[in-house]
Regions:
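Short beta-strand-to-loop capping motifs
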Residues: 40-42, 53, 193, 292-296
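ATP-dependent small-molecule kinase catalytic core of the GHMP/sugar-kinase superfamily
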Residues: 2, 12-14, 18-23, 123-276, ...
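Short, flexible, solvent-exposed loop/turn segments with mixed acidic/basic and small polar residues
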Residues: 39, 180, 277-284
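Short Gly/Ser/Thr- and Asp/Glu-enriched loop/turn motifs at secondary-structure junctions
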Residues: 6, 85, 145, 283-288
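Small/polar glycine-rich anion-binding or flexible loop at a beta-alpha turn
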Residues: 263-266, 284-291
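Extended, folded domain segments that form the structural surfaces/walls around functional sites
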Residues: 70-71, 75, 105-120, 291-295, ...
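ATP-binding N-lobe of GHMP and related small-molecule kinases
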Residues: 1-98, 115-124, 323-324, 329-330
Length: 330
């Protein structure tokens, strides 16, 4: 059995203040490339993980995938009351801790395959509870389930009183309060510089603890842009308004914190992609992935990206929104 999952761009967290009894909230876009493709079989004495093209995989990503796959197998077997061994073949992958949500997609994909192989079919939000994902942002879980442009409503502070990243939070996935198709003719160019250090683990937890709560005025400014500019732009297919909203949120609230923690090259990249004609350019999650949104001048923006990355290690990927979730092929 094979599963193909999308990746996601995390545009911003919404409310890391909590004055009105909720925290978190997220805005994101499900994207077609890069993607994960996993194949699973059961009937093995132990767990076996095979990586196609593992020679191209850096050691940190390889180790991270192995840990997450094994944890997802153990958690799902425990849920099912089984001690089954599985073979997982990782056919396609993308780097961990790159701002594209590989951890959530990988954990959900492994659990989904195990559940399906054993005759169970659960919702993504239920699977997320099994594998411990979606405790801060619900964008990755919703991308796996339904795709599209997604806004989630965060968590009640009574059930999640602390400001924590998803990897350290035991909260259940938040409710999805808006989901729309993104226009097919909008192109997304991803520029992924190779980063020597990435934000994850204790480092990520420490950032939340140091910078939160975010001032209420910042949250109010962000939600105004989201409700009265970004969301209507998606519904009306207004690329310029959507891009302008993406540009605006880079300098507000927690997203500004994420941006300020980047290497100077990342912000240089963002400025130059905007100058090249992209309608909007942003940082996905904690980066290092930068995304540019455009329609007619994709080649010019890709050319600029290649020029900027000429003496840098990394990847440039041309992608589009995916308005559906993960696909299983039996």
């Amino acid at each position: 059995m094979i599963i193909e999952t999308p990746s996601r761009l995390h545009v911003t967290l919404i409310d890391l203040n909590g004055k009105y009894g909720r925290i978190d909230g997220g805005v994101g876009i499900t994207i077609k490339e890069p993607k994960l493709v996993l194949e699973a079989e059961k009937g093995f004495d132990d767990h076996e993980i095979i990586f196609n093209n593992s020679n191209n995989m850096n050691s940190n990503t390889l180790n991270d995938y192995q840990v997450k796959i094994n944890n997802a197998i153990i958690n799902t077997n425990n849920f099912l009351g089984l001690n089954e061994g599985y073979q997982f073949n990782i056919r396609e992958y993308y780097p961990s801790h790159s701002g594209l949500g590989s951890g959530t997609q990988l954990s959900l994909a492994v659990a989904k395959l195990i559940l399906k192989i054993n005759g169970q079919d659960l919702k993504a939000s239920e699977i997320a509870e099994i594998v411990g994902r979606g405790g801060t942002s619900g964008i990755g879980v919703a991308s796996f389930e339904i795709g599209g442009f997604i806004v989630d409503g965060g968590h009640k502070t009574i059930s999640k009183p602390d400001f924590l990243p998803s990897s350290a939070s035991k909260a259940t996935p938040p409710p999805i309060i808006a989901r729309y198709d993104l226009p097919e003719d909008w192109n997304l160019i991803l520029v992924i510089p190779q980063a020597k250090s990435k934000v994850s683990g204790d480092h990520e937890v420490n950032i939340f603890q140091e910078y939160c709560p975010i001032p209420l005025v910042e949250v109010q400014k962000l939600t105004h842009i989201l409700l009265m500019k970004m969301m209507p732009a998606v519904v009306e297919g207004d690329l310029d308004a959507f891009g302008s909203a993406v540009n605006s949120v880079q300098n507000i609230g927690f997203k500004q914190i994420e941006s300020n923690l980047q290497k100077p090259f990342t912000n240089y990249l963002i400025d130059n992609l905007r100058s090249a004609g992209a309608s909007g350019v942003g940082l996905s999650s904690f980066g290092p992935t930068v995304y540019a949104i455009t329609d007619t001048n994709t080649k010019d923006i890709c050319k600029t990206a290649r020029s900027l990355m000429e003496d840098k290690k990394g990847e440039i990927i041309s992608s589009k929104a995916q308005n559906y979730g993960a696909i299983i092929k039996e």
